[in-house]
Amino acid sequence: MNANAPVQPSLDDLLGRIVRDDVRAMGAYHVPDASGMVKLDAMENPYHLPAMLRDALGKRLAEVALNRYPVPTADALKAQLKRVMRVPAGADVLLGNGSDEIISLIAIAAAKPGATVLAPVPGFVMYAMSAQLMGLKFVGVPLRADLTLDREAMLAAMAEHQPAVIYLAYPNNPTGNLFDAADMDALLRAARGPVCQSLVVVDEAYQPFAQHSWMPRLPEFDHLLVMRTVSKLGLAGIRLGYVAGHPKWIAELDKVRPPYNVNVLTEATAAFVLDHVDVLDAQAATLRAERTRLIDALSAQPGVTVFPSAANFLLLRVPDAAGLFERLLKRRVLVKNVSKMHPLLANCLRVTVSNPEENAQFLDAFAASLQDTP
């Protein structure tokens, strides 16, 4: 062995030399094992497609040319989405591998030196994460104690930080509430006026359960994008998101979009299901009715606060979120403990609204777990 040979650095040293410090300090997104559980942690639609449609979809997918790349523009699917989802005339659409990819594309396109992304908090974690990974500053503006939007604080933050991008989730995740429409309108107008000049992205991932939308108002605001996903409608497994807005915004985002980001199976599945959107709409209506039933039942439990929800999940405040979460796990019910995400969410759990059978199992387990409180 040559004594003068350079010492080979350890793998940890090599990682430290190459990987960014902030990335090394991060933790990977953890998805818990839900095998054998009543799974109420991820805001999924509990319903399958009807058997007849599943058979027809299987035949459609069998005809897909898996040996060919997707058509990069996906013009046919975009035209179908515009028609079914009532995208206003004159607006254009961009597709993404889920909304997460679209959020990343917005961050890439807006990542000028010193640029800022602003959003109410607590909110969807990907707004901050995508900003951090692209080198943008993220500014979170706390909601009020009742989890409503703080218009004055938002306007002050917009004036101070001059954000490139403002995210407004409608309904908000993880709180589930719809922000006041007058507050939203005021922020939209301020973002294109004397306060700042910003792109505003309204995230409508849960729109099927809210039945309120900013999509019809796209023609009023040339700085507004409306982002949605098909995940919450019952297609979480195919990972398809879309964003609508002025064609000039869509053209800029399209420049940073990978050319084959939506695979052929996703495209074919979405096109098929959009021809049967009435089935998904009926499922959403059932879940809205179940949401009301859950709210009534949970509100009757001692020490439980149920926050208003226009989504397919409920945010609950309980005396001991960590303990109740563990007791639910022992009863094979998985919910989301969000109590450490933000101080405003202290002792809060987030629960997906499911079908009547799973909701009944959850309510039984919840009541029993409350009674087990030490």
Curated annotation (Swiss-Prot):
The keyword Transferase applies. Its cofactor is pyridoxal 5'-phosphate. InterPro entries: Aminotransferase_I/II_large (IPR004839), HisP_aminotrans (IPR005861), PyrdxlP-dep_Trfase (IPR015424), PyrdxlP-dep_Trfase_major (IPR015421), PyrdxlP-dep_Trfase_small (IPR015422). Keywords: Amino-acid biosynthesis, Aminotransferase, Histidine biosynthesis, Pyridoxal phosphate, Transferase. CDD domains: AAT_like. Pathway: Amino-acid biosynthesis; L-histidine biosynthesis; L-histidine from 5-phospho-alpha-D-ribose 1-diphosphate: step 7/9. GO terms for molecular function: histidinol-phosphate transaminase activity; pyridoxal phosphate binding. Its EC number is 2.6.1.9. The modification N6-(pyridoxal phosphate)lysine is found at residue 232. It is an enzyme of class 2 (transferase). It catalyses: L-histidinol phosphate + 2-oxoglutarate = 3-(imidazol-4-yl)-2-oxopropyl phosphate + L-glutamate. Gene3D superfamilies: Aspartate Aminotransferase, domain 1 (3.90.1150.10), Type I PLP-dependent aspartate aminotransferase-like (Major domain) (3.40.640.10). SUPFAM superfamilies: PLP-dependent transferases. One of its GO terms (biological process) is L-histidine biosynthetic process. Homodimer. NCBIfam families: hisC. Belongs to the class-II pyridoxal-phosphate-dependent aminotransferase family. Histidinol-phosphate aminotransferase subfamily. This is Histidinol-phosphate aminotransferase 1. The gene is hisC1.
